From Swiss-Prot:
Gene Ontology terms: cellular component: plasma membrane; side of membrane
Matching Gene3D superfamilies: Acid Proteases
Pfam families listed in its UniProt record: Asp (PF00026)
Record: active site: D76, D275
Subcellular location: Cell membrane
EC number: 3.4.23.-
Region described as Disordered: spans on this chain: 435-454
Name of the protein this chain belongs to: Probable aspartic-type endopeptidase OPSB
């Protein structure tokens, strides 16, 4: 996610990130050590219009049963803590009941609940966040128990859903904010308990309209991608620390199906976070401006959003993101996002009356660039935190083929994957800001203010909940 603590850990270290290249070994065994979950979409009922476009109004989430209470939390590779809302928070107990869809946690019902500290505090760039306690309890993951598992509860919160952060332990809020020692978060705890062999997982979000995706801790599903996986290094700070899942984006281009040629936008490599917790993608301002101009998007600076006609969902142009060698090709049907009506039934329109949709790429400003769901849905990704690398392949949308392989240990490559030779190993975190070069589009095509001006920096999303593979879910058991 675009969190303050996440950005702090990067920007205070250096203006450049560096990388080393290693790899992971994936083998198929009779009894593989894999913990997996299907990702299911859900829609928050009757959300306020600003919440539809807010960062965490809904999203890719896992469903968790906390003492027979179902709680949803965002799956987030851009942060590292699991935190959930409590039933006694002022935000969740307000008259509007904003946490009703996501659920809340009542610690008084657990006999194994233990307080660790009162130091939990996390905030995000959009102004949301949570604070409260670090605690331990028993967590059941797909029938596997993790005793004395540490997570956080938000007594104070401004987000209707909690977050399941699965990034580096160094990205935990108590580390980045206070310099305290880290604790084993979910993937690290699964390794420590011997349930998976490596701190690595694969992510298949599937397309925008699909009802299901998949996350596998300790595993890869070769039936969910096309061709070969290609592996690039995660970038580290000048001090050698790995704090975030950031790689080098080396180019962006646009291709039409009719012409076939790739028109690349001139740009230097830039560090981008591969962040499943961000619904939109955020690129350097100058690069965003070039993309907007190429598709005649209309930029609204009051919302930091670009709008396009909703009919562009049928456009045959595709954006191509290159990472030294592997590419993610994204169709307009993944980038054109319909906000739907607001609480008063008004829809975003241009002044000529045509319906306006949000374009799924926004300017990053002075923050780190992020590739969120609008781009990541078109890729199959393997995040290897033990060896500090990410493997990428084109996704196979709506695939029903399953071939799950276990991620082992060591420095051998993944099945059907190769390390990218001479991959870019350093890139600036931020670029110069300013969108003065953006065209306003055709005359009279700027969105109207009624129903079309979001009040918060957006991450437009449709809700996603994760149920366990073969029916197993993430279950918190309190005894």
């Amino acid at each position: 996610m675009r969190g303050d603590s996440f950005i702090w850990s990067l920007t205070t270290a250096a203006s450049l990130l560096y990388a080393t290249v290693e790899s992971l070994q994936v083998v198929k065994r009779d009894n593989p050590s894999i913990v997996g979950f299907d990702i299911e979409r859900f829609q928050v009922a009757k959300p306020v219009h600003r919440d539809i476009i807010a960062k965490r109004a809904s999203g890719k989430t896992v469903s968790q049963d906390l003492d027979n209470q179902t709680i949803r939390a965002h799956i987030d590779t851009g942060s590292s803590d699991l935190w959930v809302n409590t039933d006694d928070s002022q935000f969740c107990s307000s008259r509007r009941s904003p946490c009703r869809e996501g659920g809340t946690f009542d610690s008084s019902s657990s006999s194994t609940y233990q307080l660790v500290s009162n130091d939990f505090n996390i905030s995000y760039v959009d102004g949301s966040g949570a604070s409260g306690d670090y605690v331990t309890d028993v967590i059941e993951v797909g029938g596997i128990q993790l005793k004395e598992f540490q997570f956080a509860i938000g007594h104070t919160s401004s987000s209707p859903l909690g977050v399941l952060g699965i990034g580096y332990e160094a990205g935990e809020a108590l580390v980045s904010r206070f310099g305290d020692e880290s604790y084993p978060n979910l993937p690290a705890a699964l390794v420590k308990a011997g349930h998976i062999r490596s701190n690595a997982y694969s992510l298949w979000l599937n397309d925008l309209s699909a009802s299901r995706g998949q996350i596998l801790f300790g595993g890869v599903d070769t039936g969910k991608f096309e061709g070969k996986l290609q592996t690039v290094p995660v970038l580290h700070t000048s001090g050698g620390d790995y704090t975030s899942l950031v790689i080098a984006l080396t180019s962006v281009g646009i291709r039409t199906a009719s012409e076939g040629s790739l028109d690349t936008f001139p740009a230097q490599p830039v560090a981008v976070a591969m962040d499943s917790g961000s619904s939109l993608s955020y690129l350097p301002d100058a690069l965003a401006a070039k993309i907007y101009n190429s598709i005649d998007a209309v930029f609204d600076p009051s919302n930091n959003l670009a709008f396009v006609p909703c009919s562009m969902v049928n456009d045959d142009r595709k954006l191509v993101f290159t990472f030294s060698s592997p590419q993610i090709t994204v169709g307009m049907d993944e980038l054109v996002i319909d906000l739907g009506p607001d609480a008063n039934g008004n829809e975003a329109t241009f002044r000529d009356g045509s319906k306006a949709c949000v374009f799924g790429i926004a300017p990053a400003g002075r923050s780190i660039s992020i590739l969120g769901d609008t781009v990541l849905r078109s890729a199959y990704l393997v995040y290897d935190l033990d060896n500090n690398e990410i493997s990428i392949a084109p996704t196979r949308f709506n695939s029903t083929v399953t071939n799950i392989m276990e991620i082992g240990t060591g420095k051998n490559s993944v099945p059907d994957a190769t390390g990218v030779p001479n991959a870019v190993t350093s890139a600036p975190i931020t670029q110069a800001t300013g969108l003065s070069g953006i065209e306003t589009g055709v005359p009279g095509a700027r969105p109207t203010s009624r129903g079309a001006a979001p009040t918060m920096r957006p991450d437009v999303t449709f809700g996603v909940a994760a149920a366990g593979l073969a029916g197993a879910g993430i279950l918190f058991a309190f005894m």
